[in-house]
Amino acid sequence: MEKLIQYCTKESLYDGAFNGKVGWHAAGMGYIIVTEEKHLIVIDGGNANDSEDFLSLIEANADGKPVVDLWIITHPHSDHDGALNRIAKTPELCARVEIREIVYRFPEEFVERNGNRSNVQANANMETVLSLTGAKAHCPELDEKVTVDSATVHFLYYPYDCRIINGIANCNVCSLIFTVQAKNKKIMFTGDANTRNLQVVKWLYGKDLKCDILQLPHHALCDTGHLDFYKAVDAAIVLEPTCIAGDRAMHSDLYCTAERARWNAFAEENAAKVYKSYEGTVEIEL
């Protein structure tokens, strides 16, 4: 049976203050796709403190020592690549899994709002991860398709022209945006994509964006989103890798009237089912 697993990260259980004064707590994100023949595609994985539990979840969905065909890192923030980093750099964890390819693309010409070029260090770190795991690097091209058994990954976006994203935020705007077409369902992954990224994808692909499942960008927070993109995807199932406090804040009077909060609310209301990661690890049949 093909299935998608949304992992309940440890930080998704955060239930404290969440506002502009204390900051927005990073919830983390991790997904596993199991194909018909039990091949594995992994997306992100959460923070370093998720490494043991996330690896155990991978093992539970494999026959024997797991072989991950593709481990996709959407962007180099620690609540997304932290688990993979910890696994790679901890010999007893690394020995428990074989990773064939790590998929990532961190353009070094990208400049953050604060002037930093954080992707330079991120790429250096990824070289270490590749060396420790023995995995091959796969830097996807625009519109590239990769098939793993019964699932086809279609890369819709990477930061191919940093001039349109330089200076507007941090490396969230470098997130890969891609779909996974399984036998009966199609999933849209957005990582922590910014509104501008979603606008570009909508411009490039238009009506071809229709999917059954949508992962809301940046933990369903109101600093991103795009109504026309959500309407084009028109997903019946919405995935929210968010924390308790973040979800509560986005639906409170503090944030719920913000334009992008309303756009995210549209995606939720348009769906038949919304899965929030803090509610627990969940499996969805594909």
Regions found by a protein language model. Name each.
Residues 50-54, 80-83, 121-129, 189, ...:
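Stable alpha-helical elements in mature extracytoplasmic
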Residues 27, 48-50, 76-82, 108-112, ...:
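Active-site environment of divalent metal-dependent phosphoester hydrolases
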Residues 9, 96-103, 107-172, 200-201, ...:
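Binuclear metal-ion centers of metallo-dependent hydrolases, dominated by the metallo-beta-lactamase
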